[in-house]
């Protein structure tokens, strides 16, 4: 065992290590009676560096023992502090990645207890697949409902395109929780602000707004302005939406980031934004639209050291992600993502 180092009746063999949780469950059952559901959350895979953490075999045996003690359902999760990525799986991990474990537990328990699966169930299609394919009896969502608390309602109504996606970035949810500040969502600015801003307020005096740039910031700004009642025209130099988020989605295992721009583009379209692609914004072209307000959302530029700004063969990360050739001998400056 990785954490249980006891040498008494509660440590050592698996049977002894299961004694404490079994006693707790039996005590709870005695207190609440036979008709009260008891749910047990279990870390099914620890994957600790020493190799002696909980594994599938231990999980199945534990669930059998705890079921006998009086549990009605198991919430199958994974990880611990030393393997945090299993607790809150990031974008690079497959959706419902731990479904094989929940399926094994479900097969071992039969009808004696229900099995729930947690871990990167980021959308309703994945949740439905987990239940339909018999991988678990219930699919549990956490971060997906932070991204869009109306996910289930929209999915049931056939409005899947309106669901704000969760890409498991962990920026506003896990990141803020670690800092002990209120959680938010990097994609949904209303998340975490429901009490102070339950909906987007209408503008007192609607006007014409010109937005420059169809990246995530520009798309969200355009959609919000249109939802407030403004006439919105968005100018984009390229022939498509997405901006730099399209480049961020190029590396392996980052494909889900494309969901961000696709969702925001659809949101802006539904709000009534007029798009003008392959249209570079200039002071004159913007003035000709007679806007009441202009929002410039043209994104950031890479920081290029002066000593290599004009060097032959020098390219930026954006250039590489756009398809530029780096050559055979490459020097990389900077260790960020």
Report residues per predicted region:
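Short, contiguous acidic/charged loop-to-helix segments that flank catalytic cores in large enzymes
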Residues: 88-94, 198-206, 247-259, 316-323, ...
């Amino acid at each position: 065992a990785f954490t249980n180092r006891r040498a008494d009746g509660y440590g050592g063999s698996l049977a002894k290590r299961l004694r404490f949780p079994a006693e707790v469950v039996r005590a709870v059952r005695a207190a609440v009676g036979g008709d009260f559901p008891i749910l047990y959350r279990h870390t099914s895979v620890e994957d600790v560096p020493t190799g002696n953490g909980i594994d599938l075999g231990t999980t199945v045996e534990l669930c059998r023992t705890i079921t006998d003690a009086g549990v009605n359902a198991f919430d199958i999760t994974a990880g611990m502090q030393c393997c945090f990525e299993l607790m809150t799986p990031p974008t690079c991990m497959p959706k419902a990645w731990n479904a094989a474990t929940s399926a094994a537990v479900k097969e071992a328990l039969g009808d004696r207890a229900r099995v729930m699966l947690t871990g990167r169930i980021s959308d309703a299609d994945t949740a439905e697949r987990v239940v339909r394919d018999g991988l678990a009896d219930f699919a549990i969502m956490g971060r997906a409902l932070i991204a869009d608390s109306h996910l289930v309602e929209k999915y049931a109504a056939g409005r899947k395109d309106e669901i704000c996606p969760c890409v498991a970035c962990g920026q506003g949810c896990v990141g803020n929780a670690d800092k002990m500040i209120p959680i938010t969502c990097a994609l949904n600015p209303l998340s975490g602000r429901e009490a102070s801003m339950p909906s987007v307020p209408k503008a007192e005096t609607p006007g014409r707004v010109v937005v420059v740039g169809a990246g995530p910031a520009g798309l969200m700004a355009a959609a919000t302005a249109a939802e407030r009642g403004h006439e919105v025209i968005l100018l984009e130099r390229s022939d498509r939406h997405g901006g730099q988020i399209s480049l961020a989605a190029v590396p392996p295992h980052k494909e889900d980031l494309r969901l961000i721009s696709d969702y925001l583009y659809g949101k802006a379209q539904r709000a009534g934004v007029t798009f003008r692609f392959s249209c570079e914004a200039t002071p004159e072209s913007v003035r000709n639209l007679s806007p009441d307000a202009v929002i410039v959302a043209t994104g950031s530029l890479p920081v290029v050291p002066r000593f290599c700004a004009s060097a032959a063969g020098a390219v930026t990360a954006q250039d590489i992600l756009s398809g530029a050739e780096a050559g055979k001998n490459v020097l990389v400056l900077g260790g960020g993502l």
